[in-house]
Design a protein with these regions (language model features):
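Acidic/polar, low-complexity intrinsically disordered N-terminal segments immediately downstream
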Residues: 24-87
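Short consensus segments that form the blades of beta-propeller domains
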Residues: 91-96, 131-133
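Extracellular/periplasmic catalytic domains that process cell-envelope and extracellular macromolecules
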Residues: 72-75, 93-99, 175-178
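A beta-strand/beta-hairpin structural motif
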Residues: 85-86, 109-182
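A short beta-strand signature
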Residues: 96-110
Length: 182
């Protein structure tokens, strides 16, 4: 075979592999979204969660009643949120940046399992440290490499967008007097 024929054969082989590998029986994006929505609805039902509309949440002073297991569904971000405590301090104002230490539990609703957490075992001594910035009412943040379990697990300083939603409603600060809650 000449070099030209070998090159042509290899290009044809690569094209064929690409074409046939793109045609698979895997679930479509629509199927994935449906499966995700079903998992969320199942979780809400099994946990007895009362879902508030944003208007109800705002009428209640932007708080949820944890005794009633209330969560608010935020339409714009597709986030279900429960505010356990608003925190002490103040909201992060437009143009400000704050260092925020946080604890979390990440669940995989599709497998009904705890994905990761820094609230038990060895990781209880690790708080995730992130820098949060409010730019004209839009929050962005990044984890500090080496000071975040999320960074260690996923290899990225990007903070999931759902983690930023509560900053519109909560205060950030250190306790200054007895009774202040973080």
């Amino acid at each position: 075979m000449t070099m030209k024929k070998i090159a042509y054969f290899l290009m044809t082989l690569v094209a064929a592999v690409t074409i046939f590998s793109s045609c698979s029986d895997d679930e479509t994006y629509a199927d994935q979204k449906k499966r995700e929505r079903n998992a969320i609805n199942r979780y809400i039902s099994e946990k007895g969660i009362k879902v508030l509309k944003e208007s109800e949440f705002e009428a209640n002073g932007c708080v949820t009643d944890t005794a009633k297991n209330e969560f608010v569904y935020l339409d714009d971000s597709n986030v279900y949120m429960q505010i356990i405590r608003k925190g002490c301090g103040k909201k992060i104002e437009k143009g400000e940046t704050a260092t925020v230490l946080c604890r979390y539990e990440e669940y995989n609703l599709l497998t009904d399992s705890l994905q990761s957490t820094n609230m038990i075992g060895y990781y209880i001594s690790v708080v995730d440290k992130m820098n949060v910035q409010n730019t004209s009412g839009t929050f962005t943040a990044s984890f500090e490499a080496g000071e975040s379990l999320m960074y260690s697990l996923y290899g990225s300083t990007s903070v999931p967008s759902g983690w930023l939603v509560p900053f519109t409603y909560i205060n950030v600060g250190r306790p200054e007097k007895e009774g202040d809650e973080i």
